[in-house]
Amino acid sequence: MREIVHIQAGQCGNQIGAKFWEVISDEHGIDPTGSYHGDSDLQLERINVYYNEAAGNKYVPRAILVDLEPGTMDSVRSGPFGQIFRPDNFVFGQSGAGNNWAKGHYTEGAELVDSVLDVVRKESESCDCLQGFQLTHSLGGGTGSGMGTLLISKIREEYPDRIMNTFSVVPSPKVSDTVVEPYNATLSVHQLVENTDETYCIDNEALYDICFRTLKLTTPTYGDLNHLVSATMSGVTTCLRFPGQLNADLRKLAVNMVPFPRLHFFMPGFAPLTSRGSQQYRALTVPELTQQMFDAKNMMAACDPRHGRYLTVAAVFRGRMSMKEVDEQMLNVQNKNSSYFVEWIPNNVKTAVCDIPPRGLKMSATFIGNSTAIQELFKRISEQFTAMFRRKAFLHWYTGEGMDEMEFTEAESNMNDLVSEYQQYQDATADEQGEFEEEGEEDEA
């Protein structure tokens, strides 16, 4: 089987990671003790992707939980599925990273990283044929962003040919925990551009808007936001966990989604949007799902896809539905909105259908878009970064951990390059291909 090793780092990563395991354990019929109580063979057919079968028919998540302070992991351990994880796979320090990327990446995190890599090796060795790694973390803090990116580069060194996939929670101005988020995020993106194959950008601002506008929650909590994240993560990984009519693994997804290696930042979406507690039992039609899924209000990143163009799109439909209808609807969307899809990648929308819907829904759809509009998100962080960096505000916290200003300048320009690469392909048309390629080559040099 093609296994995936899951790593969750930092407070945010551990919270959305724990939620993800709750949701998929439920979908696979696995209770908090790791025993199977399901009702369908499909639940077990590809269970090995995310779970290891231990003695006594117990299923143990291939999950590694990492943090620089014990707090969050204690709450995961005492949470609803806390006992399902392998106790040796909790790796934590005592010092904390204090929302400082340099502490996570160079000092505190660097001290802990070897013990994490030991666990990564142990998990990878128990795999039959490891396909890759997935990391859940945030980019605004210290541990998830600093140590998370350190782990990625170390794992990359050791497993260069395995896929590296991240679910990265991007900071947003409306939902800010820390004033140095733009620094931490820029330094992280600088790493992610080079070292990951697929990054799902999940944005707190977009999640708040969804909770507020669509779900009519007046005071959304992190629990509500994480509910949306886990629904999206469950949808995105459906093809990896269940047999479907169009099966996917991480590599196939990457091949379909990433036209240029640096442009691998995806905008996830989900339909139908339901709040916790009020899961709707009314079945949506395929046209409604398709329409909702492409709606800007359903995107989990605060970017408007109408401000850019889609390079590639993958859609995952779940539930019993007619493949023919799905294909018709997807073509319909492309024909009606053809100006929003680049014409120089002819069949750039892929659709997968999985028969098992998520809990409480008859059918659902998950959207993964590689859109040039994601540059809005990077621009937003970059502007905030520049505003502070121009005055060298807060820099002493980073230089005190041994960082150099040069690294900030490099990260800043790498992020700006990324924005202009997205812009370049947004403006590109099919006919000017000749001159366009030469430009590209100069850029590389």
From Swiss-Prot:
Some glutamate residues at the C-terminus are polyglycylated, resulting in polyglycine chains on the gamma-carboxyl group. Glycylation is mainly limited to tubulin incorporated into axonemes (cilia and flagella) whereas glutamylation is prevalent in neuronal cells, centrioles, axonemes, and the mitotic spindle. Both modifications can coexist on the same protein on adjacent residues, and lowering polyglycylation levels increases polyglutamylation, and reciprocally. Cilia and flagella glycylation is required for their stability and maintenance. Flagella glycylation controls sperm motility. The modification Omega-N-methylarginine is found at residue 318. Keywords: Acetylation, Cytoplasm, Cytoskeleton, GTP-binding, Isopeptide bond, Magnesium, Metal-binding, Methylation, Microtubule, Nucleotide-binding, Phosphoprotein, Ubl conjugation. One of its GO terms (biological process) is neuron migration. It holds the Pfam family Tubulin. It is found in: Cytoplasm, Cytoskeleton. This is Tubulin beta chain.
